Swiss-Prot record:
Pathway: Amino-acid biosynthesis; L-histidine biosynthesis; L-histidine from 5-phospho-alpha-D-ribose 1-diphosphate: step 3/9. GO terms for molecular function: magnesium ion binding; phosphoribosyl-AMP cyclohydrolase activity; zinc ion binding. Catalyzes the hydrolysis of the adenine ring of phosphoribosyl-AMP. The gene is hisI. It is found in: Cytoplasm. Its main location: cytoplasm. The lineage of its organism: Bacteria, Pseudomonadati, Pseudomonadota, Alphaproteobacteria, Hyphomicrobiales. Its cofactor is Mg(2+); Zn(2+). This is Phosphoribosyl-AMP cyclohydrolase. Zn(2+) binds at residues 94, 112, 119. One of its GO terms (biological process) is L-histidine biosynthetic process. It comes from Rhizobium leguminosarum bv. trifolii (strain WSM2304).
């Protein structure tokens, strides 16, 4: 499979906003933000980042690939856990500096490394003048210890 090459974004804002060439606008680290939701029910699953290679692999294979900022490398989401993300649709925002993946999750139907369906399982509430976290979805679809050995 040959590597997709993305053209440089146009300086003309209207060209970015219309149909035509997809010219993603990567940040100064070479990354683009990826918002990921469930293709069936629309639940927000995760927010991640992609470099050009991860984005190209995602488009070409139909399986979500991301760039890990902490590990400094590309990873196929779900490769270890079995919770692969099959991409059903990819959208971009008006100025092409963020993308939205609508996915189906295989395996345990979990996206978060904690074993939960979504990485957004906590709310933030102000108590006694201090921001605090509350867990609102504690259902584990798998045990991270069993899957990752952590």
């Amino acid at each position: 499979m040959s590597q997709l090459i993305f053209s440089q974004p146009s300086e003309d804002k209207s060209a970015l906003e219309d149909a035509g060439d997809f010219t993603p606008r990567f940040d100064d680290r070479g990354l683009i933000t990826a918002i990921v939701t469930d293709a069936g029910d629309g639940e927000l699953l995760m927010v991640a980042h992609m470099n050009a290679q991860a984005l190209a692999l995602t488009i070409q294979t139909g399986t979500a690939h991301y760039f890990s900022r902490s590990r400094g490398k590309i990873w196929k989401k779900g490769e270890t856990s079995g919770n692969l993300q099959t991409v059903k649709e990819i959208r971009t925002d008006c100025d092409q500096d963020a993308i939205w993946l609508k996915v189906e999750v295989a395996g345990h139907d979990a996206t978060c490394h904690t074993g939960r369906r979504s990485c957004f399982y906590r709310t933030i509430a102000l108590r006694d003048g201090k921001p605090m976290l509350d867990i609102v979805d504690d259902e584990r679809h798998f045990d991270p210890q069993d899957v990752y050995g952590k």
